[in-house]
Each structure stands twice: as structure tokens, then as C-alpha cells.
């Protein structure tokens, strides 16, 4: 056997993208401030130092967090702990060709808190990065207060040939009932942000359906905040350096399906 990568804590979901890229859904804990999608390639180190004990010359008594940080490969997508769940499950690409709604090619991930997260990925300068959105369920955080409650935490998921989504729960996880739940698209397209991509000045938002010119033309209609986590041996991390980021300009597209935000 040849090791592929190191630095994992407890991934509960693994998956291959349609293009064959390998991702895992890591779980929060020591050296892991939050759950999130990790892109895995040969030789990567994903932050948890326990697996380094098999490396020649490794000395746990002298090895420091600073040394680990220099090798650390950041997650492609961070799921903010709390609003976007607390313990992730399997990751699944929408390969239904539109049978499940306007999210073809995007990623879905279940969570212990009875929700499903939606994520969109892009490759920038050879590295994967992306964004996550509330999608399904309800866990009483600000991001998930209006959806229907799922019966259990989600550990496994799969698409059926008809495009419906099956969500699987496992006994012993302490997150509600066991068994399967089936999600079917009702053919209605709700107004959502479909994707967010990085630009030189800020971000480009793409929507699932056209938005009004009045909505997109007003910078005050968009709120952007930032924060970061500590990388540390302690369990998890608080949100650090939270701050509002001013939206200085909005440039909507003529069809109302996208808008570019310029940030201060």
C-alpha cells in the first residue's frame, strides 16, 4: 500500500467528482476548526498531526503547530460550524442533468443536525475553492429556520435514476430516527444564489432565476461579513476577527441572472 495523503481527523464522507477529483467531508475537532470539503491529492497534509508519526524523523516532542501550518492544505470549502452543521456526512455530486433542479454539477452534503448543505466548486490557479449554501432541513440557526425538518441526521445519500435524492440515517449517531428519506424536486425554481465566484474586485453572484433591476442595483441589499478560525491543537475554534465588509458597488447583468459586487 502507498499512502496518498495525511492530516485527516475523521472524514465521514468521501466522493469523486465527475472529473475524478477526490474529496472528503472532514469533521470538526482538534486541529480542525470546522467541517468542510477537502480536495485530496498525492502528498497533501490536511492539518491533523497524528498521522505524521509514520513519517521518518518525526518527533512529537519537538514538532510545533507552526511547522504543521507551513504544510497545511486549506479546505476547498469551509462549512461554518453551527450555521452549516456540526458533523458532516457523505458528499454527493448532482449528476441528474437537471432532474433535481438548477444545481447540476454542484455538491450536496448531509449533516448530523438534520440538514443538507449545497456547495459549488471552482478551480483557481490550480487549486479548488468554493462556497456553501443552506439547502434542506432545519437546525434552528439563522441559516436554517424556514425549511421543513428532516427526521434524522444524514450520514449517507444517493440519487435515484428518476433524479430524486435518498437520504440515509444511521443508528447510534444520536440524531433522530433511523432509515431513509426521499426528496423530490417539485419543479419550482426558488430565488436563490446559485453560485459565487471570485473576481479581481470582489465576487460574482449567479442566481437561479432573474432578479429585479431594483434589487440588484442597490448595494445596501447585499451584506458581506468575514471571519477566520484559529488553527490549533484544541478542539474547534471560535470565530475570530469578525467584521462587516462594505459593498462599494454592484454591477448587475442585463438579464438579471448575475451581479458583480465590488468590496472595500
Residue ranges of each PLM-predicted region?
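Short, surface-exposed alpha-helix to beta-strand junction/turn motifs within ectodomains of secreted
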Residues: 204-248
Amino acid at each position: 500500500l502507498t499512502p496518498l495523503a495525511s492530516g485527516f481527523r475523521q472524514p465521514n464522507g468521501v466522493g469523486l467528482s465527475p472529473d475524478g477529483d477526490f474529496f472528503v467531508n472532514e469533521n470538526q475537532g482538534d486541529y480542525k476548526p470546522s467541517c468542510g470539503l477537502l480536495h485530496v491529492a498525492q502528498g497533501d497534509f490536511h492539518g491533523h498531526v497524528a498521522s505524521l508519526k509514520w513519517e521518518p524523523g518525526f518527533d512529537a516532542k519537538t514538532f510545533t503547530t507552526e511547522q504543521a501550518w507551513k504544510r497545511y492544505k486549506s479546505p476547498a470549502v469551509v462549512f461554518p460550524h453551527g450555521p452549516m452543521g456540526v458533523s458532516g456526512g457523505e458528499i454527493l455530486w448532482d449528476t441528474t442533468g437537471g432532474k433535481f433542479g438548477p444545481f447540476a454539477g454542484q455538491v450536496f452534503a448531509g449533516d448530523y443536525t438534520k440538514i443538507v448543505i449545497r456547495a459549488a466548486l471552482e478551480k483557481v490557479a490550480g487549486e479548488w475553492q468554493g462556497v456553501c449554501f443552506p439547502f434542506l432541513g432545519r437546525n434552528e440557526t439563522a441559516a436554517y429556520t424556514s425549511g421543513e425538518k428532516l427526521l434524522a441526521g444524514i450520514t449517507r445519500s444517493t440519487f435515484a435514476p428518476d433524479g430524486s435524492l435518498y437520504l440515509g440515517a444511521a443508528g447510534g449517531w444520536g440524531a433522530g430516527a433511523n432509515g431513509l428519506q426521499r426528496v423530490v424536486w417539485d419543479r419550482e425554481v426558488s430565488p436563490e444564489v446559485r453560485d459565487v465566484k471570485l473576481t479581481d474586485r470582489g465576487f460574482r453572484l449567479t442566481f437561479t432565476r432573474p432578479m429585479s433591476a431594483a434589487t440588484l442595483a442597490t448595494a445596501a441589499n447585499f451584506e458581506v461579513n468575514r471571519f477566520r478560525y484559529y488553527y490549533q491543537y484544541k478542539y474547534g475554534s471560535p470565530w475570530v476577527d469578525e467584521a462587516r465588509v462594505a459593498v462599494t458597488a454592484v454591477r448587475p447583468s442585463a438579464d438579471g441572472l448575475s451581479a458583480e459586487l465590488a468590496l472595500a
